C-alpha cells in the first residue's frame, strides 16, 4: 500500500510517500509544495494544485494528514487550517481516504514520546526508511505522518476508531 503523508503549512506544505509491504516500509518520495507570495486564495490554489500533482505522479492508495494545533495567534491557526483544508480537498477529490493524526500521536509512533524535537523526528524517519540523509523538517513530518498511518499504532488506531467513511473522508 502506498501512503501519502501531508504536513500542512501555508508557506510550505510537506509531503512524503512510503510504500508498505507487510511490515516493511520503503521510501518513495518527499518534498514540499511552496505557495509563494500573493493573495490567500491564490496560495491555497497553489497548495491544492501541488498536492494534486503529487497524487497524480505517485498514485497513493491512502492519505494521512497532521491535525492542526491551536496556535497562540488565532489568525495563524485559521490560515494553517485553510492550508490543511486545501490539502485534504486535493486528497478527497482524488478519491483517497484521509486519516488524521495529531503531532503528539505522530511523535509517539515514530520517536517513542510525544514531546520529541523536530530533529529527533528527522533522525528517526531517516533510520526507519534507511535514508542516506535526514529529510527536511517539513518532508520529515509528512513522512512521519505516513509512517504513523502505516504502523497503525495504538494511538493512530484510536484516531479512526468509531469513525465511518463518507465521501472519502473519515467522519
Swiss-Prot record:
Keywords: Cytoplasm, DNA damage, DNA recombination, DNA repair, DNA-binding, Endonuclease, Hydrolase, Magnesium, Metal-binding, Nuclease. InterPro entries: RNaseH-like_sf (IPR012337), RNaseH_sf (IPR036397), X-over_junc_endoDNase_Mg_BS (IPR020563), X-over_junc_endoDNase_RuvC (IPR002176). CDD domains: RuvC (cd16962). Binds 2 Mg(2+) ion per subunit. Mg(2+) 2 binds at residue 66. PROSITE patterns: RUVC. The keyword Metal-binding applies. Its EC number is 3.1.21.10. The active site is at residues 7, 66, 138. One of its GO terms (molecular function) is crossover junction DNA endonuclease activity. It is an enzyme of class 3 (hydrolase). GO terms for biological process: DNA recombination; DNA repair. It catalyses: Endonucleolytic cleavage at a junction such as a reciprocal single-stranded crossover between two homologous DNA duplexes (Holliday junction). SUPFAM superfamilies: Ribonuclease H-like. One of its GO terms (cellular component) is Holliday junction resolvase complex. It comes from the Bacteria. It is found in: Cytoplasm. Its cofactor is Mg(2+). Mg(2+) 1 binds at residues 7, 138. Its main location: cytoplasm. Homodimer which binds Holliday junction (HJ) DNA. The HJ becomes 2-fold symmetrical on binding to RuvC with unstacked arms; it has a different conformation from HJ DNA in complex with RuvA. In the full resolvosome a probable DNA-RuvA(4)-RuvB(12)-RuvC(2) complex forms which resolves the HJ. The RuvA-RuvB-RuvC complex processes Holliday junction (HJ) DNA during genetic recombination and DNA repair. Endonuclease that resolves HJ intermediates. Cleaves cruciform DNA by making single-stranded nicks across the HJ at symmetrical positions within the homologous arms, yielding a 5'-phosphate and a 3'-hydroxyl group; requires a central core of homology in the junction. The consensus cleavage sequence is 5'-(A/T)TT(C/G)-3'. Cleavage occurs on the 3'-side of the TT dinucleotide at the point of strand exchange. Belongs to the RuvC family. This is Crossover junction endodeoxyribonuclease RuvC.
Amino acid at each position: 500500500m502506498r501512503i501519502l503523508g501531508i504536513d500542512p503549512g501555508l508557506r510550505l506544505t510537506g509531503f512524503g510517500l512510503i510504500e508498505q509491504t507487510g511490515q516493511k516500509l520503503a521510501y518513495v518520495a518527499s518534498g514540499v509544495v511552496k505557495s509563494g507570495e500573493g493573495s490567500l486564495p491564490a496560495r491555497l490554489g497553489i497548495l491544492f494544485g501541488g498536492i494534486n500533482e503529487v497524487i497524480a505522479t505517485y498514485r497513493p492508495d491512502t492519505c494521512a494528514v497532521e491535525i492542526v494545533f491551536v496556535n497562540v495567534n488565532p489568525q495563524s491557526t485559521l490560515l494553517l487550517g485553510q492550508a490543511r483544508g486545501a490539502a485534504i480537498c486535493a486528497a478527497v477529490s482524488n478519491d483517497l481516504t484521509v486519516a488524521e493524526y495529531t503531532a503528539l500521536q505522530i511523535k509517539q509512533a515514530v520517536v517513542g514520546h510525544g514531546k520529541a524535537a523536530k530533529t529527533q523526528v528527522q533522525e528517526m524517519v531517516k533510520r526507519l526508511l534507511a535514508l542516506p540523509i535526514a529529510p527536511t523538517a517539513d518532508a520529515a513530518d509528512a513522512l512521519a505522518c505516513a509512517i504513523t498511518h502505516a504502523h497503525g499504532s495504538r494511538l493512530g488506531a484510536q484516531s479512526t476508531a468509531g469513525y465511518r467513511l463518507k465521501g472519502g473522508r473519515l467522519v
